[in-house]
């Protein structure tokens, strides 16, 4: 059994304290956990028990940070993992937080896909939408499941035409360089060649 000889609030982080056992620095802990378990100078504690409390403290803080992180916008599972890694939490802490976030549905990659398509399907083609989702850590398998669940195919041609009209508003479409520039723009947005070609013909015909 060791004795806590000092509990010191960290200078650079008032939410954390340094714990000293028998005159030597032993661990850091979040202040809330320290107060919760009545840890102060003079208290005797087993080192194993102290380590358990440190782990609990890390879990609570990591979970609180993750919940705050998702409060502003939907996040993917991978975004949560990457965020906590940047905060230098250990893998076991991150796994714990991710499990809790999934359990309480703070994160749901399928819901993220649905929301992403609803928000950006009028700006990008399918291939670009899928690429963007994969870059955020969403699996292609889950994306495919979402695509298969749609009752109707996405009207990518109408979206392509709308974007082309906006982009080409003050451009001469009889100029081959302008047409090439516009085609590259639409391709970069993830539209297929057939949609781009049909959109170009439709917009040109309307003028």
What residues fall within each predicted segment?
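An alpha-helical, amphipathic repeat domain used for nucleic-acid recognition
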Residues: 1-207
């Amino acid at each position: 059994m060791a004795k806590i000889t000092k509990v010191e609030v960290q200078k650079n982080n008032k939410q954390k304290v340094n714990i000293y056992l028998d005159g030597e620095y032993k661990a850091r802990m979040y202040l809330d956990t320290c107060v919760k378990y009545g840890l102060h100078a003079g208290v005797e504690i087993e080192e194993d028990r102290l380590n358990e409390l440190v782990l609990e403290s890390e879990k609570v803080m990591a979970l609180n940070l993750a919940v705050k992180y998702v409060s502003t916008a939907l996040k993917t599972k991978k975004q949560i993992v990457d965020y906590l890694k940047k905060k230098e939490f250990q893998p076991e802490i991150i796994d714990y937080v991710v499990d809790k976030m999934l359990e309480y549905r703070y994160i749901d990659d399928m819901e993220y896909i649905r929301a992403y398509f609803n928000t950006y399907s009028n700006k990008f083609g399918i291939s670009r939408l899928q690429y963007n989702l994969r870059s955020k850590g969403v699996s292609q398998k889950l994306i495919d499941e979402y695509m298969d669940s749609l009752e109707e195919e996405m009207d990518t041609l109408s979206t392509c035409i709308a974007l082309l009209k906006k982009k080409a508003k003050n451009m001469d479409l009889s100029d081959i360089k302008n047409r090439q520039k516009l085609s590259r723009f639409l391709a970069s947005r993830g539209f297929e060649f057939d949609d781009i070609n049909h959109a170009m013909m439709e917009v040109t015909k309307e003028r």
